[in-house]
């Protein structure tokens, strides 16, 4: 498993000085015009390619199994909801800084960045860089977002994003010149670069030239009023917010820096994203990227995605596919002209159980806060049987922790309380005072109720119910009855947030391959959506306005460690903090992981090149396909 990212590092290189990317002056390289744009250039509707690129573009060197490509083609993919067009900002993965497959942070949209004491960040933009409509991309776009959006009480009533605050305080933002801007905090902000490299980043810039027309401080009041009425919104701020969503990519008029731009106004069942003529990357032969002219996203019913993929109706597909579809997909390869790659999932656990330590029921709250109970429930699960039954034994069996791909992986954390041992589980439950049993052999709570755990599921993964039924069978051996309640994601989460759900099932942490420089907030009670402690997370996120203060020693230690990490500017110290937090999770079993590295089917057309056969399917870090740069994928016209 450790070799997957290493493979990617030699074959799918990311952006920046530390990779095989190099930057050269535009006048030193003969750039090639994408054929689809030549008529617009000839007609004078579009500048020539050398005028569209930054003065210092990003030159992409393709090595290993990758090769420079040719222009042309439209890539087809399927989405289950129209709002999933946001994946184009994920897959495009044009970021100020981005992760390499070896998990280094390097420049992308930025020419360079300087860091002092982990609290002073100077960002250098590429001179001559342009938005997709040809307008200059400069520090004015950063100033506008900070002063007129993030710090505007009408547009941002809660103030700037939490990621921009350190100990509740914002940075000093200094515009040095058109291509240089500096952010200075009084204390370290080790998450600043990471937050800009995520699948869903904090976009700290906006196309000011476009959005100012909707802003009360810049636009014409009569024009804004007319636009508010036409859009059927309540105010200029509502209009501005609707027009401004860099992540969702649902406004075709909003300029972008991604490799493809939306040309379809919602609602629609088919969305076309065409090439960005001002995209900043170029291959070694002088071809401006992307190679592919357009990406077509078709909305399809989720249950039909496997069949449509099997029929060859998509060129690149992962969404809507599960491991259970792999056999059928492999069977259609020859007939429909595609390959099925299997990438391990990058989450800390594919399936995980979340006992709610904040549940309202005082008896259950006391039960779940006893580490012996959580450990017993973990040891009462036959992970090997689940792996064989659902994943042909190909997944990794262990607890909720980082995967072997991570430099922070420790086998002891992965294995602790993760082996199937009904005898030990029974002993732990007895020691926890749950030794009384009813006539049917089920354990009784202290008030005489049967120990029946209702596990709530969103039912989005077809294998989830199968997994829970297998858990139910082995828990019965330790005197615990598991009942399954299926609802929707929102209903399940809201019941957990309100303290009504006893236990929920979800995946583990999105980032199962973390390094010490990545924010460990998800390991501490900082978020409501960590379903083991939603009310503690609420308390942190609302500064004590709602939820409950942490009142469990081990959880309090996690919070203290998180604060230490945030204040540290020393890598080794951060590593020690991460390892201690992971150790606490393994010992306490706050989240009961089952299996990880489940293989994700990736359907790839035989005509499509530069998609790595071996990869890691990770939301953060990785942006799923994003880290492998679809702008470098290309179609072979001879196939």
Residue ranges and their predicted role:
Residues 63-90, 109, 192-201, 364-366, ...:
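A structural "hinge/loop" feature
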Residues 58, 208, 254, 260-271, ...:
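Detector for C-terminal structural segments
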Residues 39-117, 147:
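N-terminal lobe/hinge region of extracytoplasmic solute-binding protein
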Residues 149, 153-159, 173-174, 261-274, ...:
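Extracellular/periplasmic solute-recognition and catalytic clefts
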Residues 126, 247-251, 278-330, 375, ...:
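Ligand-site clamp/hinge motif
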Residues 72-81, 120-124, 142-145, 181-183, ...:
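Short, well-ordered beta-strand elements
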Residues 111-156, 182, 308, 367-369:
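Aromatic- and charge-enriched surface segment that lines or borders ligand/interaction sites
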Residues 162-240:
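Surface-exposed binding/hinge segments that line
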């Amino acid at each position: 498993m450790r070799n997957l990212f290493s493979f990617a590092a030699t074959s799918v290189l990311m952006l920046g000085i530390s990779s095989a990317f190099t930057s050269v002056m535009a006048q030193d390289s003969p750039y090639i015009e994408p054929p689809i744009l030549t008529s617009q250039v000839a007609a004078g509707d579009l500048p020539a390619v050398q005028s569209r690129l930054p003065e210092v573009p990003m030159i992409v060197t393709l090595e290993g199994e990758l090769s420079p490509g040719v222009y042309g083609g439209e890539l087809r993919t399927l989405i289950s909801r129209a709002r999933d067009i946001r994946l184009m900002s994920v897959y495009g993965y044009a970021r100020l800084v981005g992760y390499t497959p070896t998990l280094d942070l390097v420049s992308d949209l930025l020419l360079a960045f300087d860091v002092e004491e982990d609290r002073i960040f100077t960002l250098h933009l590429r001179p001559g860089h342009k938005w997709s409509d040809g307008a200059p991309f400069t520090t004015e776009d950063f100033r506008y977002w900070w002063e007129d959006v993030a710090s505007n009480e009408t547009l941002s009533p809660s103030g700037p994003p939490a990621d921009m605050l350190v100990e509740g305080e914002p940075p000093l933002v200094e515009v040095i010149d058109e291509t240089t801007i500096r952010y200075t905090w009084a204390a370290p902000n080790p998450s600043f670069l990471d937050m800009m490299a995520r699948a869903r980043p904090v976009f700290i810039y906006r196309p000011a030239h476009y959005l100012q027309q909707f802003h009360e401080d810049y636009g014409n009041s009569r024009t804004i009023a007319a636009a508010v009425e036409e859009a059927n919104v309540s105010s200029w701020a509502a209009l501005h917010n609707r027009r401004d969503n860099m992540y969702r990519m649902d406004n075709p008029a909003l300029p972008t820096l991604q490799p493809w731009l939306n040309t379809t106004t919602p609602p629609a069942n088919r969305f076309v994203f065409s090439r960005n003529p001002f995209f900043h990357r170029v291959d070694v032969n002088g071809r401006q990227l992307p190679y592919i002219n357009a990406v077509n996203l078709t909305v399809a019913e989720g249950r039909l995605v496997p069949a449509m993929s099997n029929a060859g109706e998509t060129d690149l597909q992962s969404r809507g596919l599960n491991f259970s579809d792999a056999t059928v997909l492999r069977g259609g390869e020859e007939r429909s002209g595609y390959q099925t790659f299997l990438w391990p999932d990058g989450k800390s656990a594919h399936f995980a159980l979340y006992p709610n330590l904040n549940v309202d029921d005082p008896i259950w709250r006391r039960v779940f806060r006893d580490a012996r109970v959580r450990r017993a429930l973990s040891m009462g699960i036959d992970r090997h049987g689940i792996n064989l039954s659902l994943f042909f034994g190909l997944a990794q069996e262990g607890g909720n922790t980082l995967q072997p791909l991570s430099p922070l992986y420790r086998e002891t954390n992965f294995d602790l309380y993760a082996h199937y041992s009904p005898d030990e589980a029974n002993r732990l439950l007895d020691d926890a005072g749950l030794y009384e049993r009813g006539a049917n052999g089920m354990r009784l709570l202290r008030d005489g109720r049967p120990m029946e755990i209702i596990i709530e599921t969103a039912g989005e993964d077809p294998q989830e119910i199968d997994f829970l039924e297998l858990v139910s069978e082995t828990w019965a051996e330790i005197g615990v009855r598991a009942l399954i309640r299926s609802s929707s994601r929102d209903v399940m989460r809201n019941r957990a947030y309100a303290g009504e759900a006893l236990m929920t099932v979800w995946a583990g942490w999105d980032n199962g391959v973390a390094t010490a420089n990545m924010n460990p907030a998800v390991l501490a009670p900082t978020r409501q959506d960590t379903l083991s402690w939603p009310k503690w997370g609420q308390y942190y996120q609302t500064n004590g306005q709602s939820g409950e203060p942490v009142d469990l020693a081990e959880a309090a230690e996690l919070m203290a460690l998180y604060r230490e990490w945030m204040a540290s500017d020393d890598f080794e110290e951060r590593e020690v903090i991460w390892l201690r937090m992971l150790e606490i999770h393994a010992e306490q079993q706050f989240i009961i992981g089952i299996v990880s590295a489940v293989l994700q089917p990736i359907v790839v057309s035989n005509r499509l090149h530069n998609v790595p056969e071996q990869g890691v399917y990770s939301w953060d870090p990785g942006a799923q396909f994003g880290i492998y740069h679809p702008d470098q994928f290309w179609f072979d016209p001879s196939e």
